[in-house]
Amino acid sequence: MATSPPGVLASVAVCEESPGSSWKAGAFERAYVAFDPSLLALNEALCAELLTASHVIGVPPVGTLDEDVAADVVTAPSRARGGAGDGGGSGGRGGPRNPPPDPCGEGLLDTGPFSAAAIDTFALDRPCLVCRTIELYKQTYRLSPQWVADYAFLCAKCLGAPHCAASIFVAAFEFVYVMDRHFLRTKKATLVGSFARFALTINDIHRHFFLHCCFRTDGGVPGRHAQKQPKPSPSPGAAKVQYSNYSFLAQSATRALIGTLASGGEEGAGSAAGSGTQPSLTTALMNWKDCARLLDCTEGRRGGGDSCCTRAAARNGEFETVAGDREPEESPDTWAYADLVLLLLAGTPAVWESGPQLRAAAEARRATVRQSWEAHRGARTRDVAPRFAQFTEPDAQPDLDLGPLMATVLKHGRGRGRTGGECLLCNLLLVRAYWLALRRLRASVVRYSENNTSLFDCIVPVVDQLEADPETQPGDGGRFVSLLRAAGPEAIFKHMFCDPMCAITEMEVDPWVLFGHPPATHPDELLLHKAKLACGNEFEGRVCIALRALIYTFKTYQVFVPKPTALATFVREAGALLRRHSISLLSLEHTLCTYV
């Protein structure tokens, strides 16, 4: 028991009549299918708990700032209050969205302390609390083969899913579901309530299942173990050291971006990377190419050959062909993830067009978070993780205006060029019908005009055509078109033609893994599929980690713009890496300086 992480021991020793009783009757009777939208309906209280856990927690500012200090320090987050559709401030294509609020203004919350606590999760030498929780269950209860099969299914789906807010939320929900499925009835142990008490956080889920991928077995280069003559490692464990260097880069970038929630205003977006970030991050960013080179599937291939991305693109084409021949009848549960995306992103910089549905979703989220925060107040007071103790104070509360930023990949609230750090369209890739629809939408935009009409100018007419012809839409009650309208043409343009993060995410998403497994209606085949995943223990990504190193460097430079010489060097090196992987994008300079 001495190895249990702070706060988790209590969370696995509660009785079934308390938090675990929020599961609906029969919730664990069905066969487990990872990333099944219908699972979200089995525990509304857990959904509310995770939605609350996705928010930054604010506390009243300590004292009143002196005038001299207030002139230099801004404790309020940079995200403009009031939602994405307000249209206030200088929301031009290249400028800040709104001026930062007065840190001493009445009613504002100080998000600095929570940002500092959240940053600590992404320290390279901090243990993974998801791994520690699993180890604690293993020591206390033992892990059955059935649990291993279900957990392996969840891990495989996370490797094939887009890195986005919806995926992180679903992974958090289903991790709790898998643990409670196997230990609630027999051991009276539940993880429901652990996020409310900060025993686990949404950042722990992000780090374990997506950022570091603690279960990944390919060392960051897909197919490495399948090579007939793998390159000899210079020393035992060299592959893990190389992967850890990438993890340091990614986690350092994430820490810096979280820090913008407390660093004050928009000045970080215009400051040089050398002055606006920690020296360790600056060094890591400058050395991103060396980090990527060791994890690049194209490194050392003088004769060319297929890259991870060309193989992924070919497999995507195969899936589209097969899926187009026999598209299944979508069940109403399919669109639960579309509604989840709307709930998570309404009123954030990911959505720039306002409307009744968006305002209703944002208000529903705020009401749910308020209620859940109050419902767990007593549990937080009795048992909270020590580093989050100050957030049990009566005046501490979620920052509802910022929204669920902790569930997003980049965890900052910046907006520029009518785009935000979280891409709405990347979230839609989690739905089979939308994965197909987005591919068809891009093809329609490209071939819309035979003349030299710009790609950007083709987007709105194509969306108009899609809206006018229900036969070409997914049978989702108009959700897809509504979400495209909410994102706006700039976000669509950025996703399809400009942003390396979006382009690489489309390569990472594996439709065969997400949608090509046996359904729950074929229990024997499904059980065999999960058993193969568990016994094979081959959890490989779809693209090499070199591209992820590029993503985190690029996204950090969008917020902390480097000096011109460093920027030019990065653009040249990043462009070369993308070309080696057959990824064609519009000007990286344009994307760096115009969007975020």
From Swiss-Prot:
Protein location: Host cytoplasm; Host nucleus
Gly residues bias: start-end ranges: 82-95
Domain of life: Viruses
Annotated residues for binding of Zn(2+) 2: C423, C426, H495, C502
Pfam family, one: Herpes_env
Region (Zinc finger 3): 308-581
Region (Zinc finger 1): 128-214
Annotated segments matching region Zinc finger 2: 423-502
MF terms (GO), sorted A to Z: zinc ion binding
Annotated region described as Disordered, given as residue ranges: 76-106
Binding site for Zn(2+) 3: C308, C309, C544, H581
Keywords: Host cytoplasm, Host nucleus, Metal-binding, Zinc, Zinc-finger
Keyword Zinc set for record: yes
Binding positions (Zn(2+) 1): C128, C131, H208, C214
GO CC field: host cell cytoplasm; host cell nucleus; viral envelope
Family note: Belongs to the herpesviridae UL32 protein family.
Its job: Plays a role in efficient localization of neo-synthesized capsids to nuclear replication compartments, thereby controlling cleavage and packaging of virus genomic DNA.
Protein name in the entry: Packaging protein UL32
Species per Swiss-Prot/TrEMBL record: Human herpesvirus 1 (strain 17) (HHV-1)
